Amino acid sequence: MKMFIGELVALSMMAFALGMDAFSVALGMGLFRLQLKQIFYIGIMIGLFHIIMPFLGMFLGRFLSYQFGSIASYIGGALLLLLGIQMIVTSFKKESDRFVSPMGIGLIFFAFSVSLDSFSVGLSLGIYGVRILLTILLFGFFSTVLTWMGLMLGRHFQQWLGAYSEALGGSILLAFGLKLLFSF
């Protein structure tokens, strides 16, 4: 039970870190005064992609772990480390350089692009051997809720919090990557 709680806390922190990416972009979208129905659909779509993408990543990660053993764990840690660095660097780009319209095919493209990092994390976690169902449900839940929060708070806080929220998420992934690399 104690081990499950530890895994739950670690996975929740990771899900929060990934959700911060969606949150930071949603803050920018919140400036467009979206209707509540649109906000609901955007959050659901991003949540679904944050379930599908890490699931695919974990499936591939488990395969690699089975084939390559302990070397795969180092690869997983390195991927998390690189992803964390990439999120921190991206957080300092202009918000206008990253914006995609959140309607129709633009919403699907947006949800896919925001969830690409969760594929990489899923790959790392698949190598590490975490519980798949728990992981994808946490990733979906956190990304959906954080997207909704970002959209709702966007009009008020986007200018001072936008870049920092993604940098925080990147820092958390960076820390988990370092933990995986140096725990063997």
Swiss-Prot record:
Designated gene of the protein: mntP
One Pfam short name: Mntp
Keyword Ion transport: yes
InterPro entries named in the record: Mntp/YtaF (IPR003810), Put_MntP (IPR022929)
Keyword Manganese set for record: yes
Gene Ontology terms, MF aspect: manganese ion transmembrane transporter activity
One Gene Ontology term, aspect cellular component: plasma membrane
Residues annotated as transmembrane: 8-28, 39-59, 68-88, 103-123, 132-152, 162-182
Subcellular location: Cell membrane
Family statement: Belongs to the MntP (TC 9.B.29) family.
Keywords, alphabetical: Cell membrane, Ion transport, Manganese, Membrane, Transmembrane, Transmembrane helix, Transport
Name of the molecule in the record: Putative manganese efflux pump MntP
Membrane topology category: Multi-pass membrane protein
Record's function text: Probably functions as a manganese efflux pump.
